[in-house]
Amino acid sequence: MERELLRLSETPLHLEKTWESGGVPVLTAEVTLPCCGGKSRRARRFDRYYRQYARAYLKYCEAELLPRAAETMHTALERSAPWSCARAALAYRVTLVRGDILSLYTEGREEHLPPRLTLRRAETWDRRTGFLLPLTAFFPPKTAVKKRLVRAARETAREQMETGTAAYYPNYGALLRRAFSSRSFYLADDGLHWFYPMYSVAPAAEGIVDFSLPYGEAGPFLLSEGER
């Protein structure tokens, strides 16, 4: 009997929390993450992964953002300056569901809490097994994946700099190699995307820097069931 593939529930995992300082709300957090809701071991593993992620994000908000939010509020009150309650929101976007593949990324955004920051994380799942797939799964064996993607990123960045469509730090070539992470990728209809954190290779105005390669025989490619 063929195993049923993981399917996302129409009701995602949703959590909200508010922190106060001196009885005044200074930080709110809202978390919306994917959920399967099934009873199989694969579904439970998937849901446990994102429950742990949600808890870790709320701990990050309390440990890192709350002190800054409280300080911002007290400073504004002392100066009689305008002030807004800080807000943190973590949400997800499904980028590809095709065959055995489920790919998505999450983004955490922080508002009214300088410096401006967006955090992205991505996961690509095998819907048959309920396990995460590594970046190397989408390239032929022994492919120098990092070298190939960094080279492609450098070429794209150079073209963008020449046409004035994007800005990078002067040493972007070295930074693209140094800040590369094999976990920072997702799949979409147009190919494989990999990305860099804010401020790591380009000014804040560029946000999260995203590069892509179309699917091809030399990789990246989508594996068929027989190739798993």
Give the positions of each predicted feature:
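Compositionally biased intrinsically disordered regions enriched in Thr/Gly
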Residues: 1-228
